[in-house]
């Protein structure tokens, strides 16, 4: 009986509140119009629901459907199209005299310091505009920084060359030559290392090259440097014989020798003080890297021991930290042929292939998941696309960028990125499955929302 009387009181209260709501809405239409009355009605109903819940016990039927109904109500009423501003704010005031029947109020005069909407940056930029803005901010290196980096790299090369000749006078190292993307106009900010080539002067006729696929390592990227003419020139005739492993010149032994020298024997603080910068070896890296810090810039110098091309059929072979059976082999350096091919393709049609490469390098270097994609991977992507007969103008740069992302995603799906100059080499062969998944997810998301990569 008590429950029945409680429901009766609730019903009578609801009817009384409902009549009040109807009265308010009827008068609100006259004053606020239809739109204002609708908003007032929704707010009134919400207040009514709160009162009902506070004055009555929870009902099972109400709790089941309230949540999604409230969400749908909010979803239906929240996105309203903004109405245009009144004419008084969008048009100048009339200069005629006011009507005598209407009292004139003083019009507030806005101060000259009122913010102007014309100074606000546009909120909607095209993808092409965002891409070019990223290029200007993160890719293009100031010419003064390029000049300073070249000067410091050249000075460090001279100091290191003098050290090698005094420390290892019996080893005929050639002149150390700085180079790399910085010297070829392909430096994406401070992303790429400055290359410092330390050539080994091998005796003609005492050394020959063996393709890596013909060795026990079966590595198509590498070459073995074999000692020959041992019957006429036995071991010990060449100063490089001390680095032989199984009759082959070992890149691993040479790397260990030079790494110990660079990290323990060279007085880098004194050299840095002389050149006006800080220099220290990166002992955590397997490569021979020198960190250079100037008050205006920072960059990394990679010291690369190479077997140059005159005696090796114009191939440039690098002493690189390889693993497994290939640890004593020499990695073929494709950088010279890659840059030459890109330059030739751009010269044919005044294209933007090298600009696309710099954009890809800048984005990948700035993303923790994409940093695994290095210069060689991105260069091969641009070379594969660069051979196609499509537009390579600046206006098509955004389209080519998205095309490069699609190509990378497709390559990651197959876990295969063939080398442009040697299709038997898979540049993704050393990637772990987790790395491929992480990179593929980021690139696929970037295809859906390209601006998220910037």
Curated annotation (Swiss-Prot):
Region entry Disordered, spans: 76-113
Mitochondrial intermembrane-side positions: 1-22
Keyword line: Membrane, Mitochondrion, Mitochondrion outer membrane, Transmembrane, Transmembrane helix
Cellular compartments annotated: Mitochondrion outer membrane
Example GO BP: mitochondrion organization
InterPro entries per UniProt: Mab-21_HhH/H2TH-like, MAB21L/cGLR, MID49/MID51, MID51-like_C
Residues in compartment: Cytoplasmic: 44-454
A GO-annotated cellular component: mitochondrion
Gene3D superfamilies: 1.10.1410.40, 3.30.460.90
Listed transmembrane segments: 23-43
Membrane topology according to the record: Single-pass membrane protein
Domain of life: Eukaryota
Assigned protein family: Belongs to the MID49/MID51 family.
Functional description taken from the UniProt entry: Mitochondrial outer membrane protein which regulates mitochondrial organization. It is required for mitochondrial fission and promotes the recruitment and association of the fission mediator dynamin-related protein 1 (DNM1L) to the mitochondrial surface independently of the mitochondrial fission FIS1 and MFF proteins. Regulates DNM1L GTPase activity.
Subunit details: Interacts with DNM1L.
Miscellaneous comment in the UniProt entry for this protein: Does not bind ADP or other nucleotides, in contrast to MIEF1.
Protein name, entry field: Mitochondrial dynamics protein MID49
Species for this entry: Mus musculus (Mouse)
Phylogenetic classification of the source organism: Eukaryota, Metazoa, Chordata, Craniata, Vertebrata
Gene giving rise to this polypeptide: Mief2
